[in-house]
């Protein structure tokens, strides 16, 4: 970027290896470990690396990083320190993959600083928030349903569950990247079509 002045696409697989290497070097140097055994300089080292991956007037660097989450705990110091430097995160939980939903992306835990009304537009932003609210309510209801059953839920909660399940299936349309898992050929769905689909599911236009 600084010498040849190109725009660079950088893949890091896996950023957790950088943390592990720092931890091992720190142990060899005899430094006192901090939380969960990580090096005391974890925040400084991660900041130094991530801040070099930035856009300047000379060129830009777009970085895509795979982040291993130990014990599926996002509060672990290694992933937590990494996430603090990222503009967007895509969370791939085992639970969704086990349900056969591909690509197994969790819309609730995934984040993006670009999902703002002045960037994506009011319509897109409002629809995304509506989808997340429905999925969040569904998540809250799952424990109750597991104990009492869906039939004991209120009519409103049953509708929420039905719509949330439609949303989950809608998010698992036959994508090209999922062909190997689903056996279904991939299909391209434009963003306006996707937003329109959610706008039909959320108010109940497809309940029947």
Curated annotation (Swiss-Prot):
First-level EC class: translocase
- Cellular component terms, GO, for this chain's entry? chloroplast thylakoid membrane; mitochondrion; proton-transporting ATP synthase complex
Sorted alphabetically, the keyword list is: ATP synthesis, ATP-binding, CF(1), Chloroplast, Hydrogen ion transport, Ion transport, Membrane, Nucleotide-binding, Plastid, Thylakoid, Translocase, Transport
Q: How does it sit in the membrane?
A: Peripheral membrane protein
- Pfam families per the UniProt record, alphabetical: ATP-synt_ab (PF00006), ATP-synt_VA_C (PF22919)
Matching CDD domains = ATP-synt_F1_beta_C
A biological-process GO annotation: proton motive force-driven mitochondrial ATP synthesis
Q: Which compartment or compartments is the protein found in? A: Plastid, Chloroplast thylakoid membrane
| Enzyme Commission (EC) number | 7.1.2.2
- Molecular function GO labels: ATP binding; proton-transporting ATP synthase activity, rotational mechanism
Keyword Nuclease assigned to the entry: answer is: no
Q: List the disulfide bonds.
A: none
* Keyword flag GTP-binding: no
- Catalyzed reaction equations: ATP + H2O + 4 H(+)(in) = ADP + phosphate + 5 H(+)(out)
Concerning PANTHER family, the annotation shows: ATP SYNTHASE, ATP SYNTHASE SUBUNIT BETA, MITOCHONDRIAL
Record's function text: Produces ATP from ADP in the presence of a proton gradient across the membrane. The catalytic sites are hosted primarily by the beta subunits.
Provide the assembly information: F-type ATPases have 2 components, CF(1) - the catalytic core - and CF(0) - the membrane proton channel. CF(1) has five subunits: alpha(3), beta(3), gamma(1), delta(1), epsilon(1). CF(0) has four main subunits: a(1), b(1), b'(1) and c(9-12).
What family is this? Answer: Belongs to the ATPase alpha/beta chains family.
Protein name, UniProt field: ATP synthase subunit beta, chloroplastic
**Species whose genome carries this gene:** Lonchitis hirsuta
